[in-house]
Amino acid sequence: MTDCNKRQSARARKQRSCTKMEDCLIEDQTTFYSKAELYWKEVPPTVDGMLGGYGSISSIDINGSKKFLQKFLGEGEGKTGMGCALDCGAGIGRITKRLLLPLFRTVDLVDVTQEFLDKARTYLGDEAKRVENYFCCGLQDFQPQPERYDVIWIQWVIGHLTDDHLVEFLRRCRSGLRPNGLIVVKDNVAYEGVIPDDVDSSVCRDLNVLRRLVDQAGLNIIYEEQQQNFPEEIYQVPVTISKAVENNSGEESGWTIIEV
């Protein structure tokens, strides 16, 4: 379970769009997850493999993420610490190496494919000593340690979770945050509805569906930003940053939400 990009024509996207994930899933949940695991076991443990053949966009992706994330790190209202981060769907550690380790003291990785985590130990080089945990686990089963993380980074992996499991996972992530901790989701979004990908056994949700699921998990999206300069054939990739709902007043932290 790791980061990837989907390519599909706009016409095909609309033709295969569903109104909710359950309409797209023909097989049961066990098959949905097992097919994804088998798919990733056949993917080479390289940056190009992690990005579905789009290794050339890695630097663009990382630079955009770093510019985005640094707005929320440090001291002050609405900001979080730089102690420990969690990389979800980490693969070989592409994001850990170039984004998270340069910004945080320690990082944990979680991925469903053991071969990717084994590769990460060498891919990360000397900086691997600042990785405290390599968890081999599907996110539908993963339980973050309570109050451990300043940032939980979830990129190009939520499509491998059913709606219910995504909500449950985000709730568990919420309990894994330190005070003022943040959850970042960076992923493809469909133009409309929910679009299945039979190749890697995943789905792509539109932004309104994603927002609804985040809300169900008891999180407020406090900021959104669109990743720029990706190839046109790739889905839009917004970055959303969320924090736990602390009261029922509907008030948020003061960060601007940018509609994408």
For each predicted feature, which ranges?
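Hydrophobic adenine-recognition pocket in adenosine-nucleotide-binding enzymes
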Residues: V157
